[in-house]
Amino acid sequence: MPGDASAICTLFEGDYHIALAAFINSLHTHGYRGSVWVGYRGPLPPWARGVVAHDGVSGFEAAAGLTVNFVLVETKRDLTNFKPDFLIDARRRFFPDAKSVFYFDTDIVLKCAWPFFEEWTSYGVALCEDINSPMPSTHPLRARWRRFYTPSGFSVARDLDVFLNGGFVGVTGADWEFVETWKRLLDLAEAAMDTLPEIRDRRHLFDKQDQDTLNLAAMFCTRPVSIAGKDGMDIVPGGFLMSHALGDSKTWRKNFLGEALRGYPPTSADRQFFQHTRGPLRAFSPATDRWKRLNLSAACAVARFYSRH
């Protein structure tokens, strides 16, 4: 059965359960059958019906062959900085024999048939370019990172000119060293945060700890990598893999029409998201879903005539 060789992980809290439903629906649409392991804080999603608790996991079948397992996480970290920890702990406890393990941010939806993702990991650690790419190998931030980590025994295994998005990684058991390296780098970064200058912009050594250290893992770890471009997350047109709702203005919170009237049209990620809100899991109530779709349609109509871009 497709998906049996893989395990998928994600993390959520708060209203990200809306995005989580759409993400899981997109997995189902594109053929994934297997388990989704969800680390969470706070209450379970309202759409998680018939959940059965066993051995520290609360699970239910979202659709035939697709199981969602909720794992309560206890950490003081921001969940975005808990990604490698969750991957390592979940693999050890729940799926030690999985051929491929994937992490996706919940605000991603798939556009591509699932078997391609499994094939992708056979070429190396699967990664995607970020909106802030490129970042040349000679960039001063990379030089500062090298200086910071050299005393801890890290050295550059490959020069990178791209900057990677921290919302997705796919890795086989053979390349698991990459995830362990990511965790060590993130732990060292977090331990140093109190000693670093309080700078609230990209000059900070670790502006986004999870993402910066993922990039460092790609620099320092000797395992092969396979990197998709910005199109891999719909950051630029032409992609076929995923769509990622980047930034602070999240799709499920937007007033699309209001934004369109200010000159900001719906994004590709906005439109892709609403292809996956109705099933097998209901991201919204039926009334809310209808209203948001009308709002999105009106915004798309306005955007044909008015945009800042």
Where are the model-predicted features located?
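Secondary-structure boundary elements
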Residues: 29-33, 92-100, 105, 172-179, ...
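N-terminal anchoring/stem segment of glycosyltransferases
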Residues: 1-78, 92-97, 285-309
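GT-A fold catalytic core of metal-dependent nucleotide-sugar glycosyltransferases
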Residues: 84-136
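A glycosyltransferase accessory/donor-loop signature
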Residues: 1-4, 156-159, 177-309
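Conserved glycosyltransferase catalytic-site signature
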Residues: 20, 80, 84, 166, ...
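A structural signal for short, well-ordered beta-strand segments and their strand-loop junctions
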Residues: 37-39, 100-105, 110, 127, ...
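Conserved catalytic core of nucleotide-sugar-dependent glycosyltransferases
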Residues: 114-184
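Short, solvent-exposed loop/turn segments at secondary-structure junctions
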Residues: 15, 43-44, 108-110, 132-134, ...
